[in-house]
Amino acid sequence: MDASPRSRLSRMVKWFWQRPQTGRSFALKSRDAASSSTKIDFAELAPGIDTFLGQAAYLQLGYFETLSQLITSTPELAQKESLSRAAGAAYIKHRDLVALIRERGDEPTALMLPFREQLDAFRTATHGRRTEETMLTVHITAGMLDDFYLALAHSYGDTGRRVARILQADDDRDAIVTILTAKIEADQEWRSLLGLWGRRLVGDTLLVARAALRSGH
């Protein structure tokens, strides 16, 4: 019987933290020097509701945009179809968060705009040179930040509960795990490359979470 998406993801995470093998390797994008902080105290992060909603909505829009770009750059039809499902899921989450913001009497663009520059810079910095790197970027950053905002949602009463339901909807990213797992299992060089890239993404995602949430103070 095939491994579940969760077990495949666990294997990928394990690979990320194994020491890369020596030998020929691909070059990675350089990391901005501003990403050098090492530890984050999540207990200190408590943004206002407008900050929380604006960031959550804009993040989903960013996932949708990146996945849409991946559809264009991916040659295989089956992979395009899988990516289109993931893009559609991100769009639905964005749409539902925007609807919630409007129900509260606020203008979605006004809440999202303060975080556009910062979050766009994060997306640019974590956009890989290769399609597979960017697939991994979406899978790791979206997964971590969705979980992070889901945990924060419990601080915002009924509005937070509604946000939690939106974020808990199916993200349709299982196919990305399948694609990347096949690539890693078939090629030692890709295993090393994506392992390094994955570790970098974890650190950068924690940094953007801290910076974005503290901007609400």
Residue positions per predicted region:
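Inter-helical turn/loop segments and adjacent helix faces that build the functional surface
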Residues: Q69-E81, Y149-R165, L180-S192
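An amphipathic alpha-helical core segment
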Residues: R165-H217
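Amphipathic, well-ordered alpha-helical segments in soluble domains
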Residues: L59-L67, K93, T141-F148
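Active-site-proximal alpha-helical scaffolds that flank and shape metal-associated catalytic sites
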Residues: T109-T178
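Acidic/His metal-coordination segments adjacent to aromatic residues that form catalytic metal sites
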Residues: W17, A34-G54, P114-V138
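Alpha-helical scaffold segments that form or flank carboxylate-/histidine-based iron centers
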Residues: G48-L53, L77-I92, T134, D158-A175, ...
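C-terminal accessory extensions/subdomains outside the catalytic/core fold
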Residues: Q21-S35, V208-H217
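Conserved alpha-helical segments that form or flank metal/cofactor-binding pockets of metalloenzymes
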Residues: L9-G23, A86-F115
